[in-house]
């Protein structure tokens, strides 16, 4: 019997206390890793959204500069969000905010501004508003502005151009959404054709 008892005491393995301590330590380590991964993932998403917002803002400014810089005439009587004529193709154009981002629309000088943002028939084709920056480039974000104006000194000024996350954005209350990127309050773009006289 003594031989049997000695054998049992010398058996390799864990006691119940050692096993429970090991399980407890492993569960604490696992919980820490899982929590850390979710925090890192959330931080990465925030950084990625801010970077995408800066890219969208830069792309939008480049597109706006392409449109504004080549204007050759301005529609008179519209101090805010005026229509302007592009040199390329001789088309009148108007910019507008929409639920999908900033859109531009080809129109005639005599078109009713109340129709902007809707389908308008011009000469032989129906022109729908088109996004200034494609949906793919927007990456779930939306660019929005308060207004743009034209001054007789030859500058278009866009006011409060900013980027929001599209999900949950309400255009009627933009102040309720987080701004991911923005330009200074007023950003001016020079018209390369000089000072245009409103028509």
Regions found by a protein language model. Name each.
Residues 69-78:
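Short, well-structured beta-strand/strand-turn elements
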Residues 11:
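Short coil/loop residues immediately preceding or within conserved phosphate-binding loops
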Residues 77-157, 164-169, 175-178, 182, ...:
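Type IV pilin-like appendage domain
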């Amino acid at each position: 019997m003594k031989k049997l008892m000695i054998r049992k005491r010398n058996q390799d393995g864990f006691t119940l206390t050692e096993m429970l301590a090991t399980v407890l330590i492993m569960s604490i380590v696992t919980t820490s890793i899982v929590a850390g991964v979710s925090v890192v993932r959330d931080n990465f998403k925030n950084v990625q959204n801010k970077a995408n917002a800066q890219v969208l803002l830069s792309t939008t400014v480049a597109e706006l500069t392409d449109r504004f810089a080549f204007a050759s005439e301005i529609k008179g009587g519209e101090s805010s969000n005026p229509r302007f004529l592009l040199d390329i193709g001789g088309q009148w154009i108007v910019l507008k905010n929409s639920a999908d981002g900033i859109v531009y629309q080809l129109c005639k000088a005599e078109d009713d501004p109340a129709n902007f943002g809707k389908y308008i028939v011009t000469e032989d084709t129906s022109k729908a508003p088109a996004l200034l920056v494609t949906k793919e480039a927007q990456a779930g974000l939306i660019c929005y502005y308060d207004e743009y104006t034209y001054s007789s000194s030859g500058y278009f000024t866009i006011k409060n151009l900013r980027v929001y996350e599209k999900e949950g954005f309400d255009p009627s209350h933009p102040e309720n959404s987080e701004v991911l990127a923005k330009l200074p309050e007023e950003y001016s773009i020079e018209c390369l054709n000089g000072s245009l006289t409103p028509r």
